[in-house]
Structure formats: structure tokens, C-alpha cells
Amino acid sequence: MCIRDSSNELLAHGDVDANYFQHLPYLKSQEEALGQPFAVAASVHIEPLGIYSKRHQRFEQLPQGASVAVPNNVTNLSRALYLLQSYQLIRLKPGFTDPARDQATPRDIADNPKQLKILEIESPQIPRALDDVDLAVINGNYALEAGLVPAKDALGLEKAEHNPYANILVTTPKLQDDPRIRQLAKDLNSPEVAAFITRTYSGSVIPVTDRQP
């Protein structure tokens, strides 16, 4: 069951006109939870999900039964499993080919050669668990808050190409053509904002305009 997010509840109730904190798969789960359609006004940047470790410098060093902390919310749990699969640490069942469409859970792991122990933890708490696990899959924003540099510190990062997890500016269908929303979307997609993201985060946050088609 998906938990309702207060930021989206505020938007649904008309207390705010837009929000900017989530990716599309998460928004879809919120539409289902709230019974409320939303509208995407702009895709702005990607905060790549990363795999981190204080115990190991390479995936080859992982022992049998290694512990892996992953986010416990539905969309980012699935995202973490796809990332682990991309580094051949697990293999999901056939049919799980589209991260934006096919939500995976640990029950959907078909092959787990290292017998990894998947530990579901609230996303903001995962950086604190780094000392206690072999690997931690951490959202980009929480990694940055914890003083990690994703582009340098992660053993593995999500690729930007064809990534469905861009952070988006979200509004309501009623407001999607409002000139103020359209101007905000234009500003967030401007070369100046893209340059600021690139200059400030050095590859740890990627402006959508930098993605390959």
C-alpha cells in the first residue's frame, strides 16, 4: 500500500500551486493513493541512485550473505532492485524490463548468487546505516545531505540515459496552462539552471538537458 505524501496532499487540496521533489513513478503511485490526477509541467534534473559501502571498494569483495540496505517505499525499492540488477548483483524475474512500468519487490528476485540480504529501511535513515551493512542504496539527495559525493563515492550509479527518475515540477490539470506555471517550468529548464546544477554538483546531480536521447 502506498503512503500518501503530504506535499502532494497539499497540492491536491489547492493549498499550493505546484511542487518539485519527486520523480514520475513516485507521482503515479501518489495519484493512485490520493485518487487525484496531477500534471507534469517540467522534467528538471536527475539525482542518481547510488550504491555505497564503507566495507568494500569493489563488488567482487562482497561476501556470501552480504547485507544491502534499500529504501522501503514502493517506487524507490523497485528502483534499487533494478540498480542492483544493472551491476549483476541480482537478477529479476523475466518480464521486469521497464523500471517505470514494472514495479519490483524482493519477491521478484529470480537469481541472487551472493545470497544478498535485502534490508528495507526508510530512505532518510539509510546513510546512517552505512557502518552496519555491506552495501547501501541511497537516493542522491540523502547522499548529498550525508556529505557523500555520488559521482566520486558510489561504487555504482544509475545511468542518466533513458532514466525515468527525473525530478519533475508537478501541478494540477487545472493549473498546467497557467502562465505562472509555464514560466516556472521554462525557468527550471533554462540553460542558466542547467549550468548551475552542473557547476554546483559536478555530476552528482544531472540536469535533464545533459541526458542523451
Describe every region a protein language model picked out.
Residues 42-53, 78-85, 144-186, 188-213:
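Periplasmic-binding protein-like
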Residues 41-91, 194:
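A conserved helix-loop-strand patch within extracytoplasmic ligand-binding domains
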Residues 1-3:
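Short, small-residue-biased leader/transition segments that mark boundaries at the very start
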Residues 29-41, 56, 132, 137, ...:
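Ligand-binding "clamshell"
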Residues 5-19, 32, 82-83, 104-137, ...:
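Short helices/loops that flank or line small-molecule/ion binding pockets
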Residues 90-111:
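Short mixed-charge
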Residues 16-19, 37-43:
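Short beta-strand-centered segments that line the small-molecule binding cleft or hinge
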